[in-house]
């Protein structure tokens, strides 16, 4: 979700990572389909 909302290369990945950190994950990244994928 966070990947579609923000345009720009680094910003959306940071928002995705922050979203995942808040959920207790180690971070996350945006895949090729603009989906935020959290790391375990």
Swiss-Prot record:
Q: Where primarily located?
A: secreted
PTM note: The disulfide bonds are essential for antimicrobial activity.
What's one GO BP annotation on this UniProt entry? defense response to Gram-positive bacterium
* Its biological purpose: Shows strong antibacterial activity against the Gram-positive bacterium M.luteus. Also shows antibacterial activity against the Gram-positive bacteria E.fecalis, S.aureus, S.carnosus, S.pneumoniae and S.pyogenes and against a number of methicillin-resistant S.aureus and glycopeptide-intermediate S.aureus isolates. Does not show antibacterial activity against Gram-negative bacteria or antifungal activity against C.utilis. Shows slight antifungal activity against C.albicans.
GO cellular component: a single term? extracellular region
**Additional detail:** During maggot debridement therapy which involves the controlled application of cultured sterile larvae to an infected chronic non-healing wound, one of the key factors which protects larvae against the infectious wound environment and contributes to wound healing through its antimicrobial activity.
Please identify the protein, giving its name as recorded.
Lucifensin
The subcellular location is:
Secreted
In which tissues or organs does this protein occur? Larval fat body, hemolymph and salivary glands (at protein level).
Q: Which UniProt keywords apply?
A: Antibiotic, Antimicrobial, Defensin, Disulfide bond, Fungicide, Immunity, Innate immunity, Secreted
Q: Does the keyword Phosphoprotein apply?
A: no
Q: Which family does it belong to?
A: Belongs to the invertebrate defensin family. Type 1 subfamily.
Q: List the disulfide bonds.
A: 3-30, 16-36, 20-38
Domain of life per record: Eukaryota
